[in-house]
Amino acid sequence: MANMTSSVSASQVAGELASATFEEIPALVEHYREDPRQQVIKACERALKRHAKELAERERVNGMYQLMHELGGDGVVVGVDEVGRGSVAGPLTVCAVCLPMEPRIWGINDSKKLTPARRELLSVKIAEVATAIGFCHIAPADIDEMGMARAIRTAVAGAVADTGLEPDCVLLDGNPLGAVP
């Protein structure tokens, strides 16, 4: 280590590691790995932990894209997610989205597993890259009249139709539906 301790403060190193991108972390940790300062050692440990967590997340998302490719091949795959469950929870809303294989959207997940802030951020990213998006809303009174199972089927079919696509495969919460609704 070439006199690193005198040229860069431990706080600066910690800040650099904290703001590093996923791609930058390995090289930065390697660069600072022999720095004996406790603050730098801890910052490297935190960065490596963050990198490992992000790597696991990217592997999960890559698995979703791989499933999408396996099920749809070169055809059209539409992912569907629903929110709301009947008159107690309000209306049922279903969104159908067709995403290209690239660019990958890291962090994409079932809406119920995301914080409101993360949902908002991802909705912007999805809107930027989606080849098609469709929605369907079912009012609470209609859900009560037709029943939840039929309301979900109706909303999924409506959202898929709203995309304007004829999908080869539809995924509901990441699971393939037996047949296109």
Stretch-by-stretch model annotation:
Residues 1-78, 82, 88-181:
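Acidic (Asp/Glu) carboxylate-rich active-site/surface patches
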